[in-house]
Amino acid sequence: MPSGSGVTPPATASSGSAVAPPAAASGPLNVLLVTIDSLRADVPWLGYARPIAPNLTRLAESSVVYTRAYSVSSYTAKSLAAVVSGRYPSTLYRDARFFTRYADSNRFVPELLHEHGVRSFAWHSHLYFGRNSGLEQGFDTWKLVPGIHFDPETDNDVTSDKMTALGIELLSDPKQTGGRFFGWAHYMDPHDQYHAHPEAPAFGKRARDRYDQEIWFADHWLGKLLEWAADKPWWANTVLIVTADHGEAFGEHGMYKHAFELWDVLTHVPLLVHGPGMAPRRIEERRSAIDLAPTIVELLGVTPPPDFQGKSLVPELRGAAPDAREPILLELSEDTHNPPRRALLEGHYKLIDFGRGHFELFDLAADPAESTDVGPRQPAELARLKALLASKYEGLPTVAPFGGQKLHDGGRANGPRGPGEK
């Protein structure tokens, strides 16, 4: 259930659905990934009462819906890097700026796909994506919508309409969609500032109400893109993945917006997958965005490489029983603004490492709002999960950031820029 929604999720469709599954593919598959900024898991198909996303809600009826999906991190520069690299951000060569720059010594998904004849293109609506972030690495085409402005504190632009227009332009180009392709669109509008939209339902005037209007607005324009795409010759062989880079806080834990921490409202996100031969159902097992890169490349006929740190979802998308994948790891690798944070989800427990020896343990079954640290009352469980978290990170090739910037908790970013450097 979405954090803080206070409503009961709808019945699952795993035992049957009135919506027919998409027909089987008639040729090689394409993948279209849509990420929506700041979209927490309070959405109608997961039980949220407001009709904030009617188009995606209809899409969910014919999709594989994950009810407990998690982003890897709680802000864009780190979470999306995991999606396009298949690796935890702390294992990527990167600088220490908040708007992280990734070194070209990393290998991202489009580079792997290019080796196998798959074209990659992307379109975006924030200037972070146009300032040599490194996320563009390997894409054959990388575009930004016109008329946007860079503000390091927020996003003042309204761009979902422009995103859909640019998407139609790219997807209409036979150079992009004439063969196998991987397309990626990142819709920004739910990110603060929360603009009012007169055409949207009048949810109210509070920040949360305007945020819900922003989601409705993004959904409205994404719906137009999907309606346009539905009769295109490539659509029948295209897998659509819709998710978010992170969630958003509205006063929980004294927080607003996102980044800086790893609370559930910041990391529990929607995830739905719609594609040929994928019967609609709901999967309740926890899943991580670290699994998206191996899923994308396998759908495109490419074997996930051994350095990917997640596991493909393809078998369960095609009907296999979901396997156990816990613990789920969450992280904020330290930079100029973010303190170091790590977290682990296993069963009904969540452990957060706040750094400097400070850990807190939450029993999510009894306390989904993560309000009470049960570590002092359950020292054995605390010790077990601390050891498990440590063992998981001992198995990851983490690297310090480079660039010389002063880090949030002190020290300097003097890490390597690539393999073999110190």
Label for each model-derived stretch:
Residues 1-422:
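Catalytic domains that recognize anionic headgroups
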